[in-house]
Amino acid sequence: RQRQMCIRDSYRIQTNTLIKVGKQIGLASISNMRFLPNCRSGADYKDYFPEDVPAIIVAAGPSLQKNVDLLKKAKGKAITIVVDSAINTVMAHGVMPDFVITVDTNKELKNFTAEGLADVFFLADATANTAVLDMVKPKNLVFYSTDSGTWSRMFSDAGSSLGEIFAGGSVALDAMALAIDWGFKRIIMIGQDLAMTGNKQYADGENLNQNTSFNSPTLYVKDIYGNDVLTKKDYYTFIRSIEDLAYRNPDIDFIDATEGGALKRHTRIMTLQQAIDQYCKNVYNITEMIEAIPRRFATNGNELVKQELQKMKENIELLITRMREGAEVCDKAAYMLEHKQYDKDKLRKINEKIRILDEWYADMEEHKLIKKVTCQANHDYETTIYLTEKDSVAESIRIYKNSAKLYIGIADGVADIIKTIEQCEKEI
């Protein structure tokens, strides 16, 4: 039941996110292609680090202020991955992370103002905020996740790989999923309160008061000491996602060294000092290891990206033509049935054209990109898919008309892809 609830809530979060910012997310994966030359692939770090080295995932919860300085003692003994909202706090304490990580397309620029950030190894989802990459100009950019067929093929052609890393909707969860993918057998969490510890929401935030508003409903959960603590519904979903990750990976030791915040089942509670003393013993030149991974698209990278953008543009232009043709045949079929023109041969040919179109669209390398950019059209179609008519002819008419509407929605929506491609070409 716990697993089912996690899947359901994760799906709800993904769906709501796509409806709100799906187009923005999809277009970011195009804009960010200009950062591919000389980047690294996160997949190249899989099973790369020594087995005794733990990963420390640093989030921005209020308890981070308790132990952030201790991260200096873990330098060279653990891989420190700092989530974007914790970067300024961590680096203000003189801690140089091994990696920072960012995911969200709309992450605010104020999270990336730390001095020296450009020198830190910068983990980015393919759909990360383009404005952040433009502002920070990371010297060591590492793309770690994509669901884009184009990106995956490009990394494969370059002798590496790149797939989707996702665990439930927060940057810290992505960082944990990445640590699992990289093969770490011990994951230490700090700043992962997921609750209003000490009447605060974030490590660098102000105290909450009666006028504080939240972007989701609130509820109470047990903290690590057994007391009730206030949290938010989305935080509660993240708590369950962490529990689910730990439950599904019994061979990995999940340590909650937050020293406060919500209780997370299937994790071990200890202080960060205890975790460092017990599990961060051997010293390695971590920076040298990270730097040793080769850069990708270092030779003629800009030209390669331009070629890929041109291919994508041609594919989208063909899609627009074919989607409009699909809408026309759907309208034709609906018209025939509405006027009682039951020509089975003509309808059979129309259905075959629709089948071929749907299969071609599903096989497009850009399919997932298109679904994001046209998420509203897809959502509108899916919300009516089960509103069936009792009469079979009326039901067929409904399906044809809804399909035509979807095809037109896709054809109209992908015009933004072409605009973004053209803008990206200018900026290379």
Where are these regions (language model features)?
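Long, compositionally biased charged/polar accessory segments in the mid-to-C-terminal portions
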Residues: 248-428
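Short, small-residue-biased leader/transition segments that mark boundaries at the very start
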Residues: 3-7
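Polyanion-binding loop/helix "lid" in catalytic or ligand-binding cores
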Residues: 169, 214-262
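Glycine-rich phosphate/ribose-binding loops and adjacent secondary-structure elements
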Residues: 64-79, 83-146, 150-151, 164-165
